[in-house]
Structures are given as structure tokens and as C-alpha cells.
Amino acid sequence: VAYRDRLGAERIGIHTDAASHRDILGYGIVVAGVPIGDQEYVRVHLAKTASATKSKIETISSKLRAESVQALHVLNIFCLQPIFTYWTQHVYPSDVVEPNRRYPRAEAPAAVVDSALLEVACATHGAFVRDDPFANARLRLPAKFNGGGLRSLAETAEAAFAAAVIKIAPKLIESTDDQGTKRRGFLDGIPGMAALFGEGSFDGDADFPWGGPGRFAAFITGDDRLPCSVEFTNAWSRCREAAVGDPGAADRDDANALPRSGLLAQPAENAGLIDDAGNGVPTRPLIGGMQHALSEQIEKYRRGVLDRDLRELAPSDFRRIAWLNCNATSRVWLVVLPDRDNELTNPEFAEVAARYFGAPSPACSAARGERFGRGHRGGDPRTVDEYGFTVNSVSSVPGGGWACLHDQIKNEMASSCREMGQEVSVEVHNLFSHLIPQGPGRVAWRDLSSRTRWGLVPDFAMRIRLGGDPVKFYLLELKCIHLSAAWYGQDAGCQREEARGKSCVPVEKRAKAVAAEYVKKAQETDQTYCGTAPGEIGPVEAKLRSFEKSVPLVFGAFGEASDGVEQLIDALAEAGADVHWRGMKAKKREEAKGALVAYLRR
């Protein structure tokens, strides 16, 4: 029973004769952890479950917060968030999401757990993920949509429950497969089950193994519908309303259109079936991953709405800049466990999170307004801003941070190439220098500083298959762009491309300039040290043009990478899968390649 003790606290316990009827709130039982019974019994049980979940989350958070917010963040995403998912799948959404009518002030169970998870996110990322509406919306999206990976239990409860019904219901009553063989139902012996779902509703054929169009019609229609059918119908309808239109509908402001493709294009009687042709007629069932597919369709629409809203912000708004300059490499930090090679200190993690979500830098905010360094060409010292534009755009800051960053990325990439079984040369010094003839030109070349001569020293040279082409010899040049107004400011010239829906424009803009820079340097070297007349092709330029192409590898201030980096990662994963897939105990090469792509990005 659910009862109220002498102190007024609500509890779940065993009914005894000594219990007063005035103290008993409701009766019920627990089946596999799920409360079934009177509304008050279910309410009290779920409230206790949510409270216990919240307590566990707060305990773990308090123990880890001071030690490693990175570890706490990973636990929040992968361990704490799923704790309450079981009840969102198996309890009516109205009991999990909606506040109880009798106690309107009480938070719904899902909201209680969501609040606790959000407090952990505030501890790991910063209070901006709660206070800023755009950061909060990003936090609720999955990482693959440039979100924070912390889904709201209240927002996913309908999809979780509907997916559980779609998965379980066809197995509950007797049906036949496409060969006419009878399949026993899990609840065959319970009277009324066949009438509830409709005899033959889940009979299979060659196209639909567990029932075709209209398979849930008997379940959701009728004057005497049970609460389970009402809850399922409502959950499915709300999922459809949450994904109004296709993902592009957000740009057309088509707020009243229902989805026109995917699972949610179908009404409740066809739940679980997909219309591939887009004409409203189901063509196949979805086999497995039902909740994932439902959530993904809803989240695609929400991402489209968020993308539209963020693009409408002022070009100088840092939240807009951050959103438009994140891609697959930017979000790796969200899923990386701290270890010897990937551990971040608490201040470092706070900086990474703030940059990703477009919030002010904690370090720079603390020093905002202070003056440091020397201005351009001996001018006045620079002023620290809250986002770090000034600090990150100055290459002369003591410590050589720019060079260290470049070299660390270069060495890590070379190590990854070799780990994937590829031979790679790093900083190929002798590729062009031997082409300068003996004489005054060569003497002048030798008198140059090593930094100047390195202008024609490729970062990498290797033979590899890129983009489906045959194996060729490529020069690869690593470039890093930093947080500065020249690249990310409103005068950087990226607005036109961004208005067309493009993202990560600065790194691609920098990548496009690399090949021309190489040719220009080669021409200047020929004309200055080899005696080549302007307009003619000298030995250095001829050697450069003998290679297939120079592949630019550009990394940006938000961890974003250019297309060249993604091509290299794909090529290395392909080569590594050939070498390692058996040692990885993968079933096939493709499975190993997917794991290696994630590994190389990290």
C-alpha cells in the first residue's frame, strides 16, 4: 500500500490490520520494478523512485566534483542519465511527466531527475547550461547534432513508452509468420488479450513479419478503450507533434504540418512501420532501435529549429559563432573518459565546455578589462575580453603556445598514421632544398633563418588512398587558426557562406588558401634563389607540381577540422581496419573501421 505515516511522510509498505484507512492512500503491486495499481499508489511509488535516483545522483556528484569534473560529466551522460529510463519506458507518460492533479505543486518524477542531472551539468560545464536558453537547448540535443548529450527524460518519455509498446505488443498474443506457422504469445493464457489487440493483427507476411498497416487499429479504437491504449495513442500523437514536418519544415515555418517521412509519418494504427516512398503507404517495418529512431526524428526537427534561431542572432554573438563552427571533431570531448592521454584538469574542462557552448571563458572573464602585452607595431597594450579573442589572437604571448599546439597535433597525427600501418615522413626538409643550384643563390638560401626555410617544408609526406583514388604520394600541410576577429569576427567574410546554411566556414576558407600559398612560395624561391624569370616554372615549382596535390589539414578554435582532416581519418581507418580488424575481434572490416574512425578523432 501507499500510506502516510504519523509524521505526514508518504511511504510504500505492506498492508496490516493496524493501519488506519485514513492513512492509506492507495493499493497496488510492483511487477519487475513497475508500480501497478491505484493512481495514488503509482504516484507515491514513482515519487520515491525519483527521490532515490536524485539522491544517488547528488551523492556521486558531491564525491567527484572536486576530483574530476571530466569523469563526473562522462558518468552523468552514460551512467546517471539512464538510471530512470527504465520507468519512462514502462510507466504511463502521464504518471512520469505530468504533475499529479491532487498535488499540483509537486514536480513530476521525470522533472525531479532532470533537475538533478541538470545540476550535475551545471557543476561540470557551468551555470550557463541552465540559465542560457540556447545553451540549454544544445545541452538537450545528442552529441551528433552538436549538442551536449544530456537528453531530457520528460521530453523523451512519450517516445520511450511508445517504442516499448511497439516492441512488446506483437509478442503478447498468438500470431502466424509468413509461412503460416503459429507463434505463441507471451500472454496467450490471459482472457481478453486477443480481443484487446485484435486477432490476427500481428500475423506476418513477406513484407511485414509482425503485422502490416492497421496492426494497432483494434488496440487504439473502440468505446471501451483501456488506459494503456489511451496512453499509447496520446504518446504517439505527441511524438508526431514534437516533430512537425520534415527537418526542413523549421526553415519554412510550417508549424502545423505533421511529419511526411519516417516512422512518425504514420498514424498510431501503423506505428512501427516506415513509408520510404513518402506517399503515406507503409513499405516496411523498422527492425530494432525503435526508441532511437523515434527520438532521432524528433531531435532532427529540434536541431533545425535551434539552427534557425541561432543563425538569426547577430553575427558577433559568440553563441552563434560557436554553433556554426562545430563538427565531428569538436564534440569528441563529450564522450572521452579521462586517462593518461586524455585527462583534463577542472579549469581546462571548464574552458572547453564554455568554448563549445559559446559561453564566456572562465579564465578570461576573471581577468576581463586587464591590459597585457604589446599592441600592434608597438601600440598600446591589449585589453582582455571575456571570450578570449584578444588573448588567443596574439602569437607573441610568452610560452610559445601556438607552436606547441601545432607540434602536438602534428606528432599525434604522425603517431596515428603509423599505428594504422602507414609510413609517414614528418617535416620533409630535403624535398626542395637540393633543387637550388650552387652559387650565390644557394649561399643566400643557407643564410636564411631556419624558420624562413621551413616555409617550404611540408608537415607530412605519405603514400595513401584518399577519397577512393588509387594510392598516391601526397604532401599534407597542417594549419591551425585561433580565436581571433580575423577568422571568427563579423568582418571575417563568412556571413555569405553561413547564410547559405554552411558551417565551419573559417577552416575551409583557410584550407582553400594552402595550395596557392605553396605555389607562391615555390615561385618566390625559384625567382630569388634559382634565377627563374617571372612567369616561368622553375625547379622548385616543377617539383611541387609533380605531386598529386597538397592536402590541407586545418584545425580551428572550436576543435573543428577541415574536410581534409576527415578524408585523412577515413583513409587511415580504412587502412587500419585491413591491419587490425582480426586483432580487434571485429566481425568484419567495416565494424572495425567504424571503431577506428572514433578512435582517430579522439
Q: What do these predicted regions represent?
A:
Residues 1-602:
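Nucleic-acid-interacting cores, centered on viral/eukaryotic replication and modification enzymes
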